[in-house]
């Protein structure tokens, strides 16, 4: 599922392709899958952001193709993005965060290039007070909703997995038995076993 989302959100919705510059916010299983697909699609610059607790995930992001990783708790992410891009900003901003509120959307809007960028959002917010509509329209930004994936995305994701081009074993970090389903879910959310990215359930464990 994460890899199929990677295809749908970055390739189909974000229109990432050859020489694209991309900001991926959140280095979890979704963000890392976006990293793989963006690299496969020919993106020339991939920036992944996360927090200090995401250290292990950020290292995996670099091994999967991220050119830069930014700890948003240690650096000003917008200033760093502009430094990396020479003040131009990025073509596409992908929000793969969870529970971060409006911050990823606001950063995405600011980090996009001067005109015509695309932001793909998960849309978990019920409302967005003081949305920067003027800046959004002046920059001619297109916002798309990241809501699942299509059959075509699944087919391409399976082909990507079968190609073994990327060390995807780094993403599937832990295995749990059925008796530990609750622990597995909490761990993926950062509240159980540390440094879990993607958990596999093994009935025989």
Which residues are covered by each model-predicted region?
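Rossmann-fold NAD(P)-binding glycine/threonine-rich loop
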Residues: 122-140, 152-157
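Residues in the short beta-alpha loop(s) of Rossmann-like NAD(P)-binding domains
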Residues: 50-54, 125, 149
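Glycine- and charged-residue-rich phosphate/anionic-cofactor binding loop of Rossmann-like
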Residues: 145-147, 159-182
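Helix-to-beta-strand junctions that scaffold the AdoMet/dcAdoMet cofactor pocket
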Residues: 112-115
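Mid-domain Rossmann-like dinucleotide-binding core that forms the NAD(H)/NADP(H) cofactor-binding site
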Residues: 1-75, 79
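C-terminal capping/lid region of NAD(P)-dependent oxidoreductase domains
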Residues: 71, 83, 87, 118-119, ...
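N-terminal Rossmann-like NAD(P) cofactor-binding module of classical short-chain dehydrogenase/reductase
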Residues: 93-94
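Generic hydrophobic/aromatic pocket-lining and core-packing "Φ" positions
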Residues: 35, 58, 105-109, 133
């Amino acid at each position: 599922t994460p890899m199929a989302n990677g295809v749908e959100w970055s390739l189909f919705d974000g229109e990432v392709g050859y020489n694209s510059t991309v900001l991926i916010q959140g280095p979890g299983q979704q963000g890392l899958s976006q990293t793989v697909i963006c690299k496969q699609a020919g993106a020339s610059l991939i920036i992944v952001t996360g927090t200090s607790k995401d250290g292990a995930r950020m290292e995996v992001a670099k091994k999967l193709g991220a050119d830069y990783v930014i700890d948003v708790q240690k650096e000003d992410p917008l200033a760093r993005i502009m430094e990396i891009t020479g003040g131009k900003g990025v073509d596409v901003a992908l929000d793969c965060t969870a529970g971060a509120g409006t911050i990823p959307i606001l950063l995405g809007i600011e980090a996009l290039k001067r005109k015509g960028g695309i932001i793909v959002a998960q849309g978990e917010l019920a409302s967005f007070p003081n949305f920067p509509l003027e800046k959004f329209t002046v920059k001619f930004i297109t916002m798309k909703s990241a809501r699942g994936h299509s059959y075509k995305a699944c087919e391409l994701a399976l082909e990507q997995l079968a190609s073994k081009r990327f060390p995807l074993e780094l993403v599937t970090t832990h295995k749990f038995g059925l008796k530990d389903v609750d622990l597995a879910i909490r761990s993926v959310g950062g509240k159980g076993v540390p440094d879990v990215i993607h958990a596999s359930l093994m009935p025989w464990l």
